[in-house]
Amino acid sequence: MQLGTGLLLAAVLSLQLAAAEAIWCHQCTGFGGCSHGSRCLRDSTHCVTTATRVLSNTEDLPLVTKMCHIGCPDIPSLGLGPYVSIACCQTSLCNHD
């Protein structure tokens, strides 16, 4: 009985430690895409990718911004305008191209 209790306690502690670790996301900005993985702050829960069409850009490549965020933001809260798409995910380095 004590062995089962000990195993249960070990499993709970390992889950708590995993939850306390920070997520990793690509954090960068570039036309057409970018990648630069780095650790987020502990309270970040999502990796976010935004793509903004810049009308003056002659190559018609979107300006891609990748970041860590608390939750998945809605487009108006980012203040990026009408030509924006957004994608969110919740696993480390999931916001790759």
Swiss-Prot record:
Record GO cellular component, one term: plasma membrane
Biological processes per GO annotation: acetylcholine receptor signaling pathway; regulation of neurotransmitter receptor activity
Main location: secreted
UPAR/Ly6 domain boundaries: 25-95
Expression sites by tissue: Expressed at highest levels in cervix and esophagus, followed by adult and fetal skin. Expressed at lower levels in brain, lung, stomach, small intestine, colon, rectum, uterus, and thymus. Not detected in spleen nor bone marrow. Up-regulated 3-fold in psoriatic lesional skin. In the epidermis, predominantly produced by keratinocytes of the suprabasal epidermal compartment (at protein level). In attached gingiva, produced at highest levels by basal cells located in the lowermost epithelial layers (at protein level). Detected in serum (at protein level).
Cited CDD domains: TFP_LU_ECD_SLURP2
Signal peptide annotation: 1-22
Entry's induction text: Up-regulation by IL22/interleukin-22 is suppressed by IFNG/Interferon gamma (at protein level).
Quaternary structure note: Interacts with CHRNA3, CHRNA4, CHRNA5, CHRNA7, CHRNB2 and CHRNB4. Interacts with CHRM1 and CHRM3 probably in an allosteric manner.
Protein name: Secreted Ly-6/uPAR domain-containing protein 2
Gene Ontology MF, one: acetylcholine receptor binding
Organism in which the protein naturally occurs: Homo sapiens (Human)
Gene3D superfamilies cross-referenced by the UniProt entry: CD59
Protein localization: Secreted
Keyword Secreted attributed: yes
Disulphide linkage map: 25-47, 28-34, 40-68, 72-88, 89-94
Record keywords, A-Z: Disulfide bond, Secreted, Signal
Coiled-coil region: none
Function: Binds and may modulate the functional properties of nicotinic and muscarinic acetylcholine receptors. May regulate keratinocytes proliferation, differentiation and apoptosis. In vitro moderately inhibits ACh-evoked currents of alpha-3:beta-2-containing nAChRs and strongly these of alpha-4:beta-2-containing nAChRs, modulates alpha-7-containing nAChRs, and inhibits nicotine-induced signaling probably implicating alpha-3:beta-4-containing nAChRs. Proposed to act on alpha-3:beta-2 and alpha-7 nAChRs in an orthosteric, and on mAChRs, such as CHRM1 and CHRM3, in an allosteric manner.
Pfam families named in the record: UPAR_LY6
Gene: SLURP2
